[in-house]
Every structure is written in C-alpha cells, then in structure tokens.
C-alpha cells in the first residue's frame, strides 16, 4: 500500500512539473478592474517559460474611457508557479512597466443660481514608469487552456489595486 501511495504521489507531482517546461509559451486575454480609477479594461498577454515553473509575462491593458479619462499599461512581470493541487498553480507577481493616462479636452456650460459660466479645458496626458507586486492563481482546464486570476498592487503612477481575470491558450 505504501508503494502504491508513493508511486501515485510521484506521478501527481510529475504531472504538475511537466505542465510548464522551459520554452513553453501562451497567449491570452483578460478583463481588468482598476480600483483607484474605478475603470474597467481589457488586456492581452504573452507568457514564456524561461525555465521550468519560472515564466515571463508581457501584458498590455487598455482601460475604457471614464469621465473623459482613458488609460493603458504595458508591463513585463516574472511569475514562479507553485503547483498546489492537480491543475491548480499559484504564483507571486513582480514587474515593471509604463502607465499612460490622458484626459480629453471638454467644453461645457455650467448654470447655477441664475449665473451661466462657460468652462473650457485643454486635454492633458501623463506617462510614468510603474512597478507592480501581487499574487495570482491559474486553473488548467486542459493541456492547452487555462483560466487565471491576478490581484496586483501597481505603484509609480499613483497607487492602484488591479484585479484581472482571464483565459490563456498554451502552445
């Protein structure tokens, strides 16, 4: 019985170890939410395994315009995957990138108490270097498709907490 248990444990850990090998790649998309700006966005990502369990993750996220402000981020991160159960990996996130935000120019009229004022503002934009730390989880639906969820703290362009849920295709 002990030999059977040990054999099953080795087989289980081997499945997790072979699921992510050096040279493996994946592409995917995500739905994002930036809590500081209360903005929803979409993301695209590319992942490459440098060595078993250690991957680089390149991500572009575009946040939909809200109150005249739009934003995007481009990030490069590193993740080390820990296999915690069959088909389930968790990983820390550490990365650097840029964040760009822009506010459109608006012309509007404000009326209050019988007074009418015309307000005009020029647009503005900002591009900053940012860092991020966080944690994520991945569930492998099959050998080729996985779902993931990330919770990240981004800093350098103000501090924002970002949640992202997505799906990736491995090849």
Regions found by a protein language model. Give the residues of each.
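Membrane-embedded beta-strand positions in outer-membrane beta-barrel channels/transporters
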Residues: 26-28, 43, 75-77, 132-134, ...
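Extracytoplasmic loops and strand-loop junctions of Gram-negative outer membrane beta-barrel proteins
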Residues: 27-29, 115-120, 148-149
């Amino acid at each position: 019985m002990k030999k059977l248990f040990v054999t099953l444990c080795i087989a289980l850990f081997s499945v997790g170890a072979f699921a992510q090998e050096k040279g493996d790649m994946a592409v995917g998309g995500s739905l994002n939410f930036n809590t500081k700006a209360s903005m929803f966005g979409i993301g695209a990502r590319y992942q490459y395994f440098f060595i078993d369990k250690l991957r680089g993750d390149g991500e572009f996220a575009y946040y939909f315009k809200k109150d005249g402000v739009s934003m995007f981020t481009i990030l490069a991160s590193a993740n080390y995957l820990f296999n915690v159960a069959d088909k389930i990996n968790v990983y820390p996130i550490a990365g650097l990138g840029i964040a760009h935000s822009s506010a459109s120019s608006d012309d509007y009229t404000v009326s209050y108490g019988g007074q009418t004022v015309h307000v005009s503002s020029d647009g503005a934009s900002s591009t900053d270097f940012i860092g991020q730390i966080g944690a994520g989880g991945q569930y492998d639906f099959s050998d080729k498709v996985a779902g993931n969820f990330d919770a990240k703290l981004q800093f350098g362009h103000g501090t924002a907490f970002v949640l992202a849920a997505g799906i990736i295709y491995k090849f």
